[in-house]
Each structure stands twice: as C-alpha cells, then as structure tokens.
Swiss-Prot record:
SUPFAM superfamilies: dsRNA-binding domain-like, Ribosomal protein S5 domain 2-like. GO terms for biological process: translation. GO terms for cellular component: small ribosomal subunit. With S4 and S12 plays an important role in translational accuracy. Residues 20-83 form the S5 DRBM domain. Part of the 30S ribosomal subunit. Contacts proteins S4 and S8. GO terms for molecular function: rRNA binding; structural constituent of ribosome. Keywords: Ribonucleoprotein, Ribosomal protein, RNA-binding, rRNA-binding. Belongs to the universal ribosomal protein uS5 family. This is Small ribosomal subunit protein uS5. It comes from Methylorubrum populi (strain ATCC BAA-705 / NCIMB 13946 / BJ001). Residues 162-192 are annotated as: Disordered. The keyword RNA-binding applies. Pfam families: Ribosomal_S5 (PF00333), Ribosomal_S5_C (PF03719).
Amino acid sequence: MAREREGRRRDDREERDSEFVDKLVHINRVAKVVKGGRRFGFAALVVVGDQKGRVGFGHGKAREVPEAIRKATEAAKRGLIRVSLREGRTLHHDVNGRHGAGKVILRAAPQGTGIIAGGPMRAVFETLGMQDVVAKSLGSSNPYNLVRATFDALKNEDSPRSVAARRGLKVSALQARRRDADPADTSDAAVA
C-alpha cells in the first residue's frame, strides 16, 4: 500500500515536471582557489516556463555541468511567476525593467511580429509562451542581469482587470476610455 502511494506521488511529480519547458541561458566555468591549487566547478542559468503564462529562472552551481543544470532547473521551478498576456500572445502595454546596469524595454507587438529579442530575453519569452513582442536591452549584456531585468519588467506589467480593480472601475469602462484616447484602434479584441 505504501509503495503504491509512493509510486503515485512520483508519477504526479513527473507529470508536473513534464508540463514545463526549460532553456539553458548561460553556463560558466568558475574556480575556487584552495591550498592545493584551483578547484573548478560550473554555474548554470536556466529559464523554465509552461508556455501558458508562467515562467521562472534559477541559478545552480556544482562540480559537474548536468548537476548544475539540474539545481538551476529546480530553483527556477520554485520561483515561478504568472504573467498576464493579451490574447495569450503579447503584453498588455509597454514596460521597462532594470537590474544592476542592465535595462530592458519590452513593447507589445501586433500579431505576426514574432519574438524580436536578443539572447537571454528570447529564452524568457519562448518559455513564457509569448508569441509577439519587441524587446531592447540597454547597458549591461550580462545574462544574469538581463534575465533579472526582464523579470522586473514582467512583474511591472498589469492586466486591464487589475488596473480596473485598483481604480474602482469596470473593465469595459477602462476599455472605452482607451478607445476614446486612441481613435486608430477601434477593435474590441485589441484591449482584451
């Protein structure tokens, strides 16, 4: 009976893990100086997401590359955030983020644009499930800073529902205001 329960738990864990897509962003060889010389190890930066609006990143260090990647993947799964996507494909509005000397600008894009982003940011958007976005990185090109700056920007993004709740309005009133402000945008789907 106990074995059966343990087997079921393992199956549930494997099923939960299989829903995530992980991307290795950066691997770095690090050295620890000890009395007898240098002891080498590896540091890995991994981004994990379910391609449905949840994404996380993790950092892992170990003596061997696969172990560092495994640790980073586990850390990423522990730190998942949920991002609200417009029409399930892009951002609701433009956002900026920064971490250290790394700055990123993320812009919502029309359908069919694709992911226009470099290096570490592309991995974040692909695992998040975003299909259309234009991103620009400024300052530091360090992958750790860029991933953290991208996450800072994604955390600053608000859905129309959360903005309406904060202002004490209905979502339809908020969308009506947006249509009044932008005469070129007359579609209801553009603000969904």
